[in-house]
Curated annotation (Swiss-Prot):
NCBIfam families: PRK04250.1, pyrC_multi
Lineage of producing organism: Archaea, Methanobacteriati, Methanobacteriota, Thermococci, Thermococcales
Listed transmembrane segments: none
Record's protein name: Dihydroorotase
Stored SUPFAM superfamilies: Composite domain of metallo-dependent hydrolases, Metallo-dependent hydrolases
GO CC field: cytoplasm
Length: 409
């Protein structure tokens, strides 16, 4: 008899099957298409059990920006949105660019994270410090973004990174000439990054690709050690939305319908969907800060798209679990015997309205405020613990650091 059994429908080998998952000591100990016995059984009917979804691009702020977000509020938001692990970004205040700051960040994450996490390090001419930090991944900004620090020599910083690099690709010269950050800023930077990647053959993850030229350049090169992310806001919003609502300022900016359409036309080729959750106070947003909160809406937006026939549940699993696990080499997260019992449970037909005042993030606004969505996260389970149920966080902060090995390329 298992300690816990989840019974109902779940995604297994590319299909939705009925059955049961046995869990003991936080690990998956049985996967069966029949009913199995447990000391506690949670039986689902209309819901579907997904492997625990992962967001590879999250700004948890904290440090000197606790008014914007903290590790606690951000990782609670993650669980609420069905995200079981977040990749914490390093352009904090102060930035995570030396071993002392990195270790301070680890201490905060260890004490206050409700979700699991990967810890990052910001690279900008500080290779010596990077080699001592032992981060899970390394971030390079090719052009200035929130925080203002960017790499003066991308190839040098990328070359010295001790692990996988995630890159914010916008060309600084183009931005200086045109602060509105036209598509060419992204396309030039992506092509430069790809040239370095082809030469160095080191794993590279290109963040928030938003343009026709950007996505086409990556697909054309087809380098096995290069992955890329697309955000829900670039999939679902355009520059016309920004014209109506200045709070939608984000880097890279929302694009024209032509670019949004290209992302959808290439949707099957997109490896990773990530939120780029970037919370600010409403005062900072009104003063021009760039960034959109997304942890508590990204999965629901994709479920709503699935209900409209644009994508499938399998796409969500592929782009928010399978590919992040494979590319970053996250150990213990595959849905198989002996691995962690970590799940995102969705009700694919549940209708609800986006109410930012009920969010756990400190950013109490959303581009989708008041929007009715079909499909909702109803429970989040980490290592056999129900940590979120029915919009309520019901566990203490028990998040742990992911075991990121660097991936298979």
């Amino acid at each position: 008899m298992h300690e816990l059994v989840l019974s109902g429908r779940f995604v297994l080998n590319g299909e939705i099957v009925g059955g049961s998952i046995g869990i003991d000591n936080g690990l998956i100990t049985e996967i069966s298409r029949r009913d199995i016995k447990g000391e506690e059984v949670i039986a689902f009917k209309s819901e579907i059990i997904l492997p625990g979804l992962i967001d590879t691009h999250v700004h948890l702020r904290d440090f000197e920006q606790k008014e914007k977000e903290t590790v606690e509020s951000g990782t609670k938001a993650a669980l609420h949105g069905g995200i079981t692990a977040v990749f914490d970004m390093p352009n904090t205040k102060p930035p995570i660019m030396d071993v002392k700051t990195f270790e301070k960040r680890l201490s905060i994450l260890e004490k206050h994270a409700y979700s699991d996490y990967a810890a990052s390090f910001l690279l900008a001419g500080n290779c010596g410090e990077a080699s001592r930090a032992r981060a899970d991944f390394y971030k390079i900004f090719m052009g200035a973004s929130t925080g203002g620090i960017f790499s003066e020599n991308f190839e040098s910083d990328y070359s010295c990174a001790p692990g996988i690099v995630s890159v914010h690709a916008e060309d600084p010269e183009t931005i200086r000439e045109n602060p509105e950050r036209p598509p060419e800023a992204e396309i030039r930077a992506i092509k430069k990054a790809l040239t370095a990647a082809e030469k160095l053959r080191k794993p590279l993850n290109v963040c928030h690709v938003s343009t026709v030229g950007g996505i086409e350049a990556i697909i054309k090169k087809n380098l096995p050690w290069v992955s890329f992310e697309v955000t829900p806001h670039h999939l679902f919003l355009t520059s016309k939305d920004f014209e109506r609502n200045p709070l939608l300022k984000v880097y890279p900016p929302l694009r024209s319908e032509e670019h949004r359409k290209a992302l959808w036309e290439n949707f099957s080729r997109i490896p990773i969907i990530a939120s780029d959750h970037a919370p600010h106070t409403i005062e900072d947003k009104e003063a021009g800060a760039a960034g959109i909160p997304g942890l508590e809406t990204e999965v629901a937006l994709l479920l709503d798209a699935a209900n409209r026939g644009l994508i499938t549940v399998f796409d969500i699993v592929e782009k928010m679990h399978d590919n992040p696990v494979r590319f970053f080499g996250i150990k213990g997260r595959d849905f198989s015997l002996g691995n962690e019992a970590t799940f995102t449970i969705i009700d694919p037909k549940k209708e609800w309205k986006v109410k930012p005042e009920e969010f756990y993030t400190k950013a109490k606004w959303s581009p989708w405020e008041g929007k009715k969505l079909k499909g909702k996260v109803v429970m989040t389970v980490i290592r056999g613990m129900v940590v979120m149920e029915g919009d309520e966080i019901i566990e203490e902060p028990k998040g742990v650091r992911l075991d990121v090995q660097g991936g298979n390329h």
